[in-house]
């Protein structure tokens, strides 16, 4: 973690619905705590332990599996159709929303971190395909492990999705930013982001892995 990074460790459970909507619309990110309980996390970890994964092109310590939405079962019941998540998304986007993607990712010890980037790329890309060209999307990142400073915590540049500057080109990547924020969270929480906000994660310098289920939803329009 950068020694200059700010840490946003507020009590997210104290936010009202209006404050949550404003947070993701204006700041570009939000934490919804306690969406999964300890037993649900354990059940999901038992499932993910059976999955075959592949390494990213930049690190053997970053593993992933795509298209987990087609597995059904626990992924649908506990994650994709999580009632508290859907309740918030309906308040944010309206009643009709569409699931665009669902991916599993595991950051193992030695993972070098992910540079600051956006998931919203209006002309498509080799990484996100045409899905990233949706005009509006909310990424919902469920964490099955605690986000701590040493095990790949989430990082984000608040309000970067609002910038008109050339440096906010959604195809750019940055190693760091002076206003980036580290966002810790407990296992079972989800970090929600506007898909145009610059975000990433810090290296895993700890002794354990960090598992994540990353979903993308958009309004039906």
Protein language model features and the residues they cover:
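Short edge-strand/loop segments of extracellular domains
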Residues: 107, 157-163, 216-221
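Short coil/turn motifs at secondary-structure junctions
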Residues: 106, 145-147, 200, 220
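A structural signal for short, well-ordered beta-strand segments
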Residues: 101-104, 140-142, 213-217
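Catalytic core of non-heme Fe(II) oxygenases with the double-stranded beta-helix
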Residues: 111-184
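Short hydrophobic-aromatic micro-motifs
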Residues: 32, 142, 191-193
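A conserved hydrophobic position in a structured secondary element of the catalytic/binding core
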Residues: 81, 157, 193
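Catalytic core of Fe(II)/2-oxoglutarate
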Residues: 170-221
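Non-heme Fe(II)-dependent double-stranded beta-helix
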Residues: 1-26, 32-128
């Amino acid at each position: 973690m950068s020694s200059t990074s700010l840490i946003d460790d507020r009590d997210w459970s104290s936010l009202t619905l209006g404050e949550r909507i404003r947070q993701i619309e204006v700041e570009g990110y939000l934490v919804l705590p306690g969406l999964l309980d300890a037993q649900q996390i354990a059940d999901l970890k038992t499932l993910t332990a059976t999955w075959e994964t592949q390494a990213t092109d930049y690190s053997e310590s970053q593993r992933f599996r795509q298209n987990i939405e087609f597995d059904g079962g626990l992924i649908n019941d506990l994650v994709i159709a999580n009632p508290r998540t859907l309740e918030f998304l309906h308040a944010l986007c309206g009643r009709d929303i569409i699931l665009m993607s669902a991916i599993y990712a595991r950051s193992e010890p030695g993972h070098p971190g992910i540079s600051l980037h956006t998931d919203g790329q209006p002309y498509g890309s080799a990484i996100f395909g045409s899905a990233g060209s949706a005009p509006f999307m909310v990424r919902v990142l469920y964490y099955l492990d605690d986000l701590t400073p040493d095990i790949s915590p989430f990082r984000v540049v608040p309000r970067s999705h609002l910038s008109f500057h050339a440096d906010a080109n959604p195809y750019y990547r940055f190693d760091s930013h002076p206003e980036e924020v580290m966002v810790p969270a407990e296992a079972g929480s989800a970090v929600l982001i506007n898909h145009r906000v610059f975000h990433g994660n810090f290296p895993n310098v700890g002794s354990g892995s960090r598992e994540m289920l990353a979903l993308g939803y958009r309004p039906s329009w």
